[in-house]
Regions:
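Membrane-interface helix/helix-cap signal primarily in integral membrane proteins
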Residues: 1-176
């Protein structure tokens, strides 16, 4: 048991963003691996990197991406909706995870580490984002797509009701 835990920990620790690739544009192909979480200016989601198309770049296998709509209407992504289990090509800019280590506070860096998210970043706003595949059939992705379908059903049923899906989708967040 101890040896296996050590091997897994070493494997996870090695899967990190090299410092020389922080803050640089990198083109990646991968799959949206989680239910996107919407916020005021965009969406945030886990992304499984399948291929790095920028020569010489090395990235972790799983990253947390934000995709911003932009401040101005002409910067919005032209109605591109992102869903779990889709394969995309993005140009991203990443950094290593950083979080506060307060004794009684939330440890963001540990939270990311527990989920295998070894870098955070964002989709570059003026670069071309291309959906390559509408559905990648792997068990974890199928579950995320089902969660997405359930969330969309709640949204359609409730419309603009004040209790909108936030309260109803809380079990979906806990299941993740």
């Amino acid at each position: 048991g101890f040896l296996w835990a050590t091997v897994l920990a070493e494997h996870r620790l090695r899967d990190r963003l090299p410092s020389e690739w922080e803050g640089r544009d990198v083109q990646v192909v991968g799959v949206v691996a989680s239910l996107p979480h919407g916020f005021e200016r965009g969406e945030r989601f886990a992304f499984d990197v399948e291929a790095v198309e920028t020569p010489g770049a090395r990235l972790p296998r799983r990253i947390m991406l934000s995709w911003y709509h932009g401040w101005l209407e002409d910067e919005w992504r032209d109605g591109l909706a992102i869903r779990p289990a889709e394969r995309w090509r993005f140009t991203v800019r990443l950094k290593r995870p950083h979080g506060n280590a307060n004794p009684h506070g939330f440890d963001y860096e540990a939270w990311l580490f527990e989920r295998g998210l070894r870098a955070t970043g964002y989709v570059r706003p003026r670069a071309v984002a291309q959906r390559l595949d509408d559905f990648v059939a792997r068990p974890a992705y199928v579950i995320e797509r089902l969660r997405d379908r359930l969330r969309r059903s709640f949204s359609e049923a409730l419309g603009d009701a004040p209790a909108r899906p936030d309260a109803l989708t809380e079990p979906l967040k806990l299941a993740a």
